[in-house]
Amino acid sequence: MALFYLIIKHKNKKKRVKKIDRHKYTDMLTSLKNRNYLNAKMSEWEDCNVYPQAIVMVDLNNVKYVNDNYGHSEGDNLIIKAAALLVNTQLENSEIIRTDGNEFLIYLIGYSERQISTYCKKLTKEMKNLPHEFGAAIGFSMIEDSIKTLDDAINEATLDMINAKEDFK
């Protein structure tokens, strides 16, 4: 009887740990992975020897305007819709992470620069269909070999995204 109790106790503990991990790595608003997940995956992705890889950065436009003029719940609804759009247009071999309030990172493996560029253009077009002229600034960076680090690619994609944001204004 004591052995049975220990087995059940161990299984329950494993379930609790899984639930804690799920909450630790999941964004509560969008149900996407969060920054904690990104930080946990970075070294694994750095060790990946499959190329090309790409980082896509997405920054939603006009969130502050929507929050100020329509309320934070409307801003949250738009972020949820944008996250759903990202999931619905997600490519195979990719992960979508909400890194900040209105920013997302997409990590992709096995796509050419041309394919990533086409994907980003499609995302930009789709984001414009969201309410309140929401839109998004999107930038990307390719990792062709082990010389460029993920941090370098994230920085390059962020700069590309910032340039796209300037073009939006």
Predicted regions and their residues:
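Alpha-helical transmembrane signal-anchor helices
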Residues: 1-16
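Short beta-strand-to-loop capping motifs
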Residues: 106-111, 142-144
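Short catalytic/binding micro-motifs of nucleotide second-messenger systems
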Residues: 88-93, 119-133
